[in-house]
């Protein structure tokens, strides 16, 4: 599978990883706040 622009693929992969990281932090923050306030 050859990509015409591998640099663009890398950028999209990094953006996806960033979104997953933010989502993970968001979920952990919700769980942590529920653990504290309960």
Curated annotation (Swiss-Prot):
Alphabetized, the UniProt keywords read: Chloroplast, Membrane, Photosynthesis, Photosystem II, Plastid, Reaction center, Thylakoid, Transmembrane, Transmembrane helix
Instruction: Check the record and name the InterPro entries matching this protein.
Output: PSII_PsbL, PSII_PsbL_sf
* Coiled coil, from the record: none
A single GO BP: photosynthesis
* The keyword Oxidoreductase belongs to this UniProt entry's keyword annotation: no
Per the UniProt record, which residue ranges are transmembrane?
Answer: 17-37
Question: One GO CC term of this entry?
Answer: chloroplast thylakoid membrane
Q: Does the keyword Amino-acid biosynthesis apply?
A: no
Q: Main subcellular localization, coarse class?
A: plastid
- Subcellular locations according to the entry: Plastid, Chloroplast thylakoid membrane
Assembly and partners?
Answer: PSII is composed of 1 copy each of membrane proteins PsbA, PsbB, PsbC, PsbD, PsbE, PsbF, PsbH, PsbI, PsbJ, PsbK, PsbL, PsbM, PsbT, PsbX, PsbY, PsbZ, Psb30/Ycf12, at least 3 peripheral proteins of the oxygen-evolving complex and a large number of cofactors. It forms dimeric complexes.
Known function: One of the components of the core complex of photosystem II (PSII). PSII is a light-driven water:plastoquinone oxidoreductase that uses light energy to abstract electrons from H(2)O, generating O(2) and a proton gradient subsequently used for ATP formation. It consists of a core antenna complex that captures photons, and an electron transfer chain that converts photonic excitation into a charge separation. This subunit is found at the monomer-monomer interface and is required for correct PSII assembly and/or dimerization.
In its UniProt entry, what is this protein called?
Photosystem II reaction center protein L
Lineage start:
Eukaryota, Viridiplantae, Streptophyta, Chlorokybophyceae, Chlorokybales
């Amino acid at each position: 599978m050859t990509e015409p622009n591998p640099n663009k693929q890398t950028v999209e992969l990094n953006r996806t990883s960033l979104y997953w990281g933010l989502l993970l932090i968001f979920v952990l923050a919700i769980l942590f706040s529920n653990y504290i306030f309960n």
